[in-house]
Amino acid sequence: MPEPYPVDPLGYLTDTQAWDRDFADSRAAADGLSLSAEHWQILDLLRGHYAEFGSAPPMRLLTRLVTQRLGAELGNSRALYRLFPEGPAKMACKYAGLPKPVSCI
């Protein structure tokens, strides 16, 4: 059965317009995660940033954006790694249907 979403070999969508919440849920489940309300806040923030600037933010910028828009409780590396243990910028962008950030942890 063919992949229902156009992805590259690393699992990132090759067409950001093909993203939907089911894509995020299925990718997270494949990584052993269940997306919480906090995850969705980050994913929505990333998609908004991408829509406005045409790029996925690297880790430092992601942390700053989360702090500014969602508060310091989520806007720190420890909280972001708790949500996205394999690397917040990398995992969150994958689930959000965005390209892998150029410089991500």
Language model features with spans:
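Acidic, aromatic-enriched beta-alpha/helix-loop junctions
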Residues: 33, 40-45
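Helix-rich interaction surfaces within compact, conserved domain-sized segments
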Residues: 7, 61, 67-105
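Amphipathic alpha-helical segments that form the core helices of the histone-fold
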Residues: 43-50, 67
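Short acidic, glycine/proline-enriched loop segments that cap or flank alpha-helices
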Residues: 34, 52-58, 80
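N-terminal first-folded block
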Residues: 1-35
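Short acidic alpha-helix initiation/capping motifs at coil-to-helix transition points
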Residues: 15-23, 40-41, 55-58, 69-72
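Gly/Ser/Thr-rich helix-start
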Residues: 12, 55, 98
